[in-house]
Amino acid sequence: DVDENANQVVTAASAMKVTGFTPDTTPPTATGFTMNLKAGEMIITFTQPVDGSSVNVDQLTLQDHATAPTDAGSYTLTAGTKSSALSTEVTITFVEADLNKIKERAFCTKTNGIDDCYLSFSATFVDDATGVDVSVQLGTAGVKATVYTADDIAPELVQFVRYNQATGEITLSFTEVVDPATFDPAKLTL
C-alpha cells in the first residue's frame, strides 16, 4: 500500500472466486498503416493488441481512394508473410506476384505517396487477443496510409527470353514489373 505495507498472501487453497466477469467485446480498429514498396511490406496499426497468427492476408484490399475506388485502382492481396506476435502492429510482407501487381496499378504511387494509398478489409482479417473480430474497414471508408516509402530501386534485366525472327520481337525478363511505355529500344544493344 502507500505506507509500504506488504499485501496478505492468498494461497491457491484460499483463492477467492470471481463474483462477476465482463468479457472484452470491443473490436480492434485500424488507425493507419505504413506502405514500404522498397522493402515490399506494410505495417498496420490497431487501437489494441491483435493476434498476428489470426491474420488472413487475402482479406486485405489496397485502393486508390478512401471511398469508391476505381476498378484499376484496387487490388486484393493473395498471400504474404505475416507477423505472428500479439501486438498493436501487424507486418505483412508481400509475395512477389502481389508486389508486382501493386506496382503496376494506379494506387500507392510514387507521384502521390499517401494521397492515393488506402486499405480496406473484412471482419475476418484479424482477431484481437481474446478472439474478437477486427472492425470492418469497408472499401467505401478506406484507412489512409500514414507513411509511404517509394520503390526507388531500378529494375534489372534478368534474362533474354526469346527472339522471334519472323516478327522481330524480343522478350526480356526483369527483376520486377516494368512500364513498357518507358522502354527505349534505341538504347538496347544485341
Language-model segments: residues:
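Non-catalytic beta-sheet/beta-sandwich ligand-binding modules that flank or precede catalytic cores
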Residues: 1-190
